[in-house]
């Protein structure tokens, strides 16, 4: 029986060494990774726009005059049970930070292809009849096969709140959560890079959604790859997965806690998507993700939990993250 991980790594390694452009996906559990040579992709089944690297040409389709977008979040009582399981593990010292997610049924009069086409997000991917992802979060970039950087995104607030930027940057819980992830990513990059440093710490991005503007907090961690790195991107990416920002720290015990608490399959949600253009490699974390489950649309979203987190605030955050980055969608 073919080992999908081995096949995936061999594909990316070979194409990277040969400088052959490719696009790839890795699911959260790294059980069903997929990779395609760019010149072999059927755009009727796979579409991507990864920070401008795209197989989509031509004008956009028209949207309905009135865009419908309704969400039916999990009941707070159900979320509270998952949250309590996470908190008990945090207090027992089994983790410092856990990214807890939940599935939210949605209804919309847009197709997944419409959402892909019109979403205002730097990293977008559409897989026919399966999912659409419109992510704002970079995972890693590698320039000229030498310089590596990662951009963990941790911390979200409604920009309409009074003094929102200062509020989130001065919040002790948010600060501790972000510091934990930066430390984790710095350690992760040290697995593949010789020298690692924090280039930018806790900078703010504005994200426009269908019903509000959100502020997101990110950091940039940079490093230099060994001189003998020759484009073995399959080996490199698998050493860094899963992404720290969507698991927590430490990773192994935190993934166990996530599995126990969430009780559903993330699938490609919180996995990684990316491309290699023959010279530069770029990837994104698959957050902001809608999945087609037998004709029903499920939006998966999550947030980081620490020992000082409050359930009602975390519950509201996962609801706030269920949005379309399309103006006038309501």
Feature roles, as predicted:
Residues 1-330:
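Extended alpha-helical targeting/anchoring segments
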């Amino acid at each position: 029986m073919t080992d999908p991980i081995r096949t995936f790594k061999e594909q990316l390694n070979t194409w990277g060494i040969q400088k052959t452009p490719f696009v790839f996906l890795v699911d959260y559990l790294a059980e069903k990774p997929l990779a395609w040579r760019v010149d072999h992709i059927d755009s009727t089944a796979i579409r991507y726009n990864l920070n401008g690297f795209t197989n989509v040409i031509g004008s956009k389709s028209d949207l309905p005059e009135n865009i419908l977008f309704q969400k039916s979040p999990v009941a707070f009582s159900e979320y509270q049970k998952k949250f309590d399981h996470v908190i008990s593990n945090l207090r027992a010292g089994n983790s410092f930070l856990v990214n807890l997610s939940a599935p939210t049924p949605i209804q919309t009069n847009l197709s997944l292809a419409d959402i892909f086409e019109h979403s205002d997000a730097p990293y977008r991917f559409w897989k026919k009849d399966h999912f659409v992802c419109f992510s704002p979060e970079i995972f890693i970039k590698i320039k000229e096969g030498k310089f590596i950087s990662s951009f963990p995104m941790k911390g979200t607030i409604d920009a309409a709140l009074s003094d929102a930027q200062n509020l989130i940057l001065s919040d002790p819980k948010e600060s501790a959560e972000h510091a934990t992830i930066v430390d984790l990513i710095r350690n992760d990059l040290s697995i593949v890079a010789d020298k690692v440093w924090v280039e930018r710490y806790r900078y703010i991005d504005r994200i426009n959604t269908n019903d509000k503007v959100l502020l997101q907090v990110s950091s940039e961690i940079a490093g230099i790859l060994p001189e003998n790195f020759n484009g073995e991107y399959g080996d490199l990416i698998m050493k860094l997965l899963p992404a720290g920002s969507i698991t927590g720290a430490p990773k192994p015990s935190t993934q166990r806690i996530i599995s126990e608490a969430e009780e559903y399959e993330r699938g490609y949600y919180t996995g990684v998507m990316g491309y290699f253009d023959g010279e530069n490699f770029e990837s994104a974390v698959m957050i902001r993700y809608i999945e087609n489950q037998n004709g029903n649309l499920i939006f998966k979203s999550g947030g980081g939990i620490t020992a000082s987190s409050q359930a009602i605030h975390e519950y509201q955050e996962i609801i706030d993250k269920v949005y379309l980055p399309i103006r006038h969608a309501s």
